[in-house]
C-alpha cells in the first residue's frame, strides 16, 4: 500500500501475513504457516509494486521519493531475508529513496528473530519495533506469547546495539495484570536511554479472536473500566 502526503513524499506499507502462532487477542490478517516459497513471494511482491507504480503513472500522480517503508504483519521479522532484500531493491528502483528514509520492521523477541537483527540492519532496516507486550512471565503466558521476560529484555538490548531507532510495544489493562507490575514495566523502558519510542495498547476483545470466543462462553474475565483507567493514568 502506498500513501502520499502534501510534500509529495511516498510511504510504503508491506504486509507479511504469517506468524509462529496466533495470539489469542489478535484480529489482524495473520496466519500460521510453516511453508514459504521465497521465489513465489518475491514474484508476488514485485508484481504488486509494479502495479502500484503503473497506477501512479496512469493517474498522473507526481511524487518525489519514498520517505518511509513499514514492514508489518503478521510477523515480518520471520520473512526470509531474500524477500526483504528484493522488496527494498525493487522499491528503490521504482520510486527512489529519500536520503533519510525510515525503513521499519516489526519483530518478536524470540531468539530466532533476534539472531537476524544484524542481517536486517545490513539490508537497510534502520528502525525495529519489538512486540515485548509484557515483562511478566505469567502475563506473557496469558497473552499467548512464546517468549519470556528474559527473552524480551535480551532482544531489546541487542536491538539498541544494532539499530539507531528502536520501539517497544506493550499491552495493558487485562485481567490478572497488577498495576504495580505495569508501573514497573513502564519505568524500566522509560529509563532506557536508547529507546526512541513506546507504543502502549489497551487490551480489547475483538470479534474473531480466541479471547472473544472465550469471553462469550464465560471463560475469560475482563477488568472494569475504572480499573482500566488506572492503568492509563
Where are these regions (language model features)?
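N-terminal [4Fe-4S]-dependent radical SAM core
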Residues: 1-12, 59-63
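Intrinsically disordered, low-complexity peptide-like regions
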Residues: 5, 13, 25-27, 106
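Structural motif
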Residues: 9-11, 23, 102
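Alpha/beta-hydrolase
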Residues: 14-16, 132
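Local cysteine-cluster metal-coordination motifs and their immediate loop/turn environment
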Residues: 17-30
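Conserved non-cysteine loop/helix-boundary elements of the Radical SAM core domain that shape
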Residues: 30-57, 61, 65-233
